[in-house]
UniProtKB/Swiss-Prot annotation:
SUPFAM superfamilies: BH2638-like (SSF158504). Belongs to the UPF0223 family. Gene3D superfamilies: BH2638-like. This is UPF0223 protein SSA_0938. It comes from the Bacteria. InterPro entries: BH2638-like_sf (IPR023324), UPF0223 (IPR007920). Signal peptide: none annotated. It comes from Streptococcus sanguinis (strain SK36).
Amino acid sequence: MNKNYSYPLDLSWSTEELASVLSFFNNVEAAYEQKVQAEKLLKSYEAFKQVVPSKGQEKRIGREFENVSGYSLYHAVQEAKSKGKGSISLGK
């Protein structure tokens, strides 16, 4: 996948909010490119949900992220929730 893509960010977010969203995106990327601890991904998802509480906005950001990266926020979170503990890897 193209490594030179832009994250779907809202410029009205504070620095801390941007950091939370970027951390979540990075953990999703890690789940596809290497592996990531399920707990770490879920913790970053909780922080992401503090910034993006609306399900509609979450879906929109998820679609935008998947369009540019090829990685699904939804699938990564679902895999982490089903695994609970340990590492997850969604790479081919």
